[in-house]
Amino acid sequence: MTNSVFETLKKIGVTSETTKKLFNARTRDVEGLNVWKDSQSGVVFIDDFYTGDETYVDGGYRDDKSVELKTGKPDFERTNDAQRRFKSNLKFVAGKKIADFGCGSGDFLKLVNPFCQSVIGIELQQNYLDDLNAVGISCTNNLESIDDGSLDAIVSFHVIEHLPTPLETLESLKRKVVSGGYV
């Protein structure tokens, strides 16, 4: 059974039918994929985008869009996103043991790595996982391989809408951080 992001957010009390408002009728790269914003909590979310783990393991959904596959370098938007995330989140991760859940090619981890005690990526797409391990950034495809209470913070960008059971996954992530840690 898959739970929509909306249902998950409603269950934890950060949105409702009356406060959920259409924020945009598209994402940066997908026309017709609605982006919602809750008028009370400010939470922005995409609903119902889980396509199955196999899609994320082989990475085929990215092949036709990847400038990096053609040039060896990330595109401007991806680089810009990584820089913005770095600037916004360094204060939460500096000096800490962190993980990036759904880290993709590891752009964020590569930027924060020099400032953190340790970093680890959690990523299903095998070529990204292999590439990160090859450049010395630890990466796994198995959340359970990370000890409970071993991290200070876990970040995740544009991942929750791709999960079949978001609340269960968030609960699993929470177990991996120390008491008082961030998810």
How would you name each of these model-derived features?
Residues M1-F157, P166-L170:
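Conserved N-terminal segment of class I S-adenosyl-L-methionine
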